[in-house]
Amino acid sequence: MRILGIDPGLRTTGFGVLEKHGNKLSYIASGTIKSNGETDLPARLKTLFDGISEVARTYTPDCAAIEKVFVNVNPQSTLLLGQARGAAICGLVGQGLPVFEYTALQLKVAVVGYGRANKEQVQEMVMRLLSLPGRPSTDAADALGVAICHANGGDTLGTLSGLAPELVRKGMRVRRGRLIG
C-alpha cells in the first residue's frame, strides 16, 4: 500500500510518500509545496491545490493521510489554515484518493511514542524509522509522520491516546501504534 501524507500550510505544505509491505515501511519521496506569501489568498490556494494534485499524480498513492487543524490562539490563522487544508483535501479527492485525518497528538504518539514531542524529536524519529540519510524539513517530517501514523493503524490511536493518563500510571505507553508496558 502506498500512502501520501500531507502537513497542510498556507505558505509551506509538506508531503511524504511511503510504501507499506507487511510491517515494513519504505521511503519513496518527500518535499514541500510553497506558495508565494505576496500573492492573494485565492492564488495561494490554487498553488496548493495544483501542487497536491501533481504530487498525487506523480506518486500514485492508494490513500492519503492529512493532519487535522488545531485551534490556534489567533482565530484568523486557524481559518486560513483550514482553507489551506480544504484546498489540499480537494486536490486529493480530485485524484480519487480516500483521505484519512489524524491529529498532531496521534502523529506524535505513532512516531515518537510521546504526544508532546517537539518538531526536532519528530524529525529524528522519522529519519530513524525510514532509514533516511538526514533529517527531513519539519514540514516534510510531519507529512511523513502522518503517513507513518496511518500505516501503523493510526485509526486506533485516538482511542488509545484518550487513555494515556491511565496507561502512564500503570507504566504503559503507546509506541508506533502499539501498547507496550
UniProtKB/Swiss-Prot annotation:
It holds the Pfam family RuvC. It comes from the Bacteria. Mg(2+) 1 binds at D7, D139. Keywords: Cytoplasm, DNA damage, DNA recombination, DNA repair, DNA-binding, Endonuclease, Hydrolase, Magnesium, Metal-binding, Nuclease. The keyword Cell inner membrane does not apply. GO terms for biological process: DNA recombination; DNA repair. Binds 2 Mg(2+) ion per subunit. The active site is at D7, E67, D139. One of its GO terms (cellular component) is cytoplasm. Transmembrane segments: none annotated. The keyword Magnesium applies. HAMAP family: RuvC (MF_00034). This is Crossover junction endodeoxyribonuclease RuvC. It comes from Cupriavidus pinatubonensis (strain JMP 134 / LMG 1197). The lineage of its organism: Bacteria, Pseudomonadati, Pseudomonadota, Betaproteobacteria, Burkholderiales. The gene is ruvC.
